[in-house]
């Protein structure tokens, strides 16, 4: 089977080709219809990402090279794409640690994060001998088994119960929940998972610096259908393997860029 990815480069935001790409995306964004401003929950996602990146920086030296340029092959065509990594540690010349940060109230966001990291590992393995991956999950209301039981007892219960985190972990044997950074599995085939609460983020960033005023109207507005597991992506993508939809686990910049890119041209690089 032909490789799905090729010609990767690990770059920073000053890369000339990447800057030209972003300019193209922002021009496309200007031509799109006006969109609603981000909700507090979406803003919190970006704030939580910044807080956890700062937390990681107290333990590791984070690299500015956290953008991956690569070709994705589909049949006889190849499309240039870009993928932003939330945090990168270049501990050795041929070793890299990649962190994916998610703030979500849906357990299924873990499945998407794991798939994104699996693809990232496949791409970066062409550059590095060892690629370790970790998900930092901020739980903003993932239902417990008791929550699901109460929900399904209601008259207007959904037709399908939302999965709990334990249920999702049960179908992802290569995702291991770790109690701390030091307790992570060193096996590069394993995706490690560290779970954080909203209170943990408040302790890191301070409640006054976070958007925490989530009301029922906002929660209802974000109750959208789950996207397909492997959606067809646009020709150019800021992050790939993610559907170009609004979700509570998107940070505002990435969501805006993905929305702007949804009408991009296709073609060979």
Q: What do these predicted regions represent?
A:
Residues 229-269:
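OB-fold/S1-family RNA-binding modules
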Residues 1-228:
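Intrinsically disordered, low-complexity Ser/Thr/Pro/Gly-rich regulatory segments
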């Amino acid at each position: 089977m032909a490789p799905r990815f090729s010609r990767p480069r690990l770059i920073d935001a000053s890369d000339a080709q990447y800057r030209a790409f972003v300019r193209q995306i922002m021009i496309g964004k200007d031509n799109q219809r006006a969109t609603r401003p981000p909700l507090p929950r979406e803003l919190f996602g970006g704030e939580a990402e910044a807080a956890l990146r700062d937390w990681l920086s107290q333990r590791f030296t984070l690299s500015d090279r956290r953008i991956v340029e690569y070709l994705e092959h589909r049949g006889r065509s190849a499309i240039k794409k870009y993928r932003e990594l939330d945090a990168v540690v270049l501990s050795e010349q041929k070793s890299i640690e990649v962190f994916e940060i998610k703030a979500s109230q849906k357990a299924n966001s873990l499945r998407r994060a794991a798939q994104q990291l699996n693809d990232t590992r496949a791409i970066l393995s062409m550059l590095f001998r060892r690629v370790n991956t970790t998900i930092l999950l901020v739980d903003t209301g993932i239902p417990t088994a008791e929550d699901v039981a109460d929900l399904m007892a209601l008259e207007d219960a959904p037709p399908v119960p939302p999965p709990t985190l334990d249920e999702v972990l049960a179908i992802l044997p290569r995702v291991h929940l770790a109690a701390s950074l030091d307790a992570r599995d060193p096996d590069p085939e394993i995706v490690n998972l560290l779970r954080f609460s909203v209170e943990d983020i408040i302790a890191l960033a301070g409640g006054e610096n976070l958007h925490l005023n989530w009301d029922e109207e906002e929660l209802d507005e974000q109750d959208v259908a789950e996207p397909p597991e492997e959606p067809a992506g646009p020709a150019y993508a800021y992050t790939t393997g993610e559907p170009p939809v609004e979700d509570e686990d998107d940070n505002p910049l990435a969501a805006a860029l993905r929305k702007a890119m949804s009408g991009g041209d296709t073609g060979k690089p």
